Each structure stands twice: as C-alpha cells, then as structure tokens.
C-alpha cells in the first residue's frame, strides 16, 4: 500500500498513537497524520502545537507527514491519494463507532478503505485525556506519552500559573 491517513485530534499525542503510527508505517510507504481542526472540541494545545508535537514524536520514523485538516476526512484522503484510513480500536465500543464511520467514508469516497488496528495491550488503555489528568494530578506520564509531551505540558502549566 502506498499511502494511508491516520486522523485524530492528538491533544496531546500519546504512546498509543505512536504505536499505531509505527504499525501503520509498516503497512504503507507513506503515513499522513491528519491533525483535525475540530471546532467542537476545546483543545489544550493549539493546532500548530499538536502538529509540532507529532512531528517531534515521530521523527524517528520514515515516510511520516503531519498535516492539519478540516472538512471531510474522505475528501482529505482523496486529496492526498490515500488508499486507506488507519483507525485504532480499544474495544467493542470503539469498533462499533469506527465501523459506522468507515461506512460513511466509503459512501463519500468509494475508493477508500478503513483499516482497524486493535490497540496494543500495553498501550490500549492510554488516551489523551488520561495523559492530561495524570499530569494535572502530578502523576508520572512517562509510561503514557512521548518525552516532548511532558515538556510541552510543563511549559503549558507554567504559562497558566
């Protein structure tokens, strides 16, 4: 497979995301990380910060591009000549939701497939919300997020203090 798209808000990127991106990079020559401009979500990190964190966290991988997007994911995938979307699933609730989204994206772009990757057991419980909550309560986020995220959270915390 030549190109896949891995979409998300990544607020912030976690080791679960990095695991999925690493696995996706073994399936395709090019992985486009589509960072969502989601106006309905209030994010801790702005779009540029989220893109920068992803670029830093994936610098060790080849064939990775980090690109912000808004609008329909099916259109974005087509613009970037992607054959498939990569979506991580942590359980049956995620699977049900992702299957619905896959059908919508297929209806919008008949050439587009969706690949559901089960989360790794070691990272499947990690979410961006978990990272932010553990950090907020002075917990160690090293097992959950790349080092650049810890630094960014420390900076964000000092700016807000």
Curated annotation (Swiss-Prot):
One Pfam family recorded for the sequence: CTP_transf_like
Taxonomic source organism: Psychromonas ingrahamii (strain DSM 17664 / CCUG 51855 / 37)
Signal peptide (from-to): none
Subunit structure: Homohexamer.
Localisation per UniProt entry: Cytoplasm
Cofactor dependency: Mg(2+)
Gene: coaD
EC category: transferase
Protein's name in the database: Phosphopantetheine adenylyltransferase
EC number(s) stated in the UniProt entry for this protein: 2.7.7.3
The UniProt record lists the keyword Transferase: yes
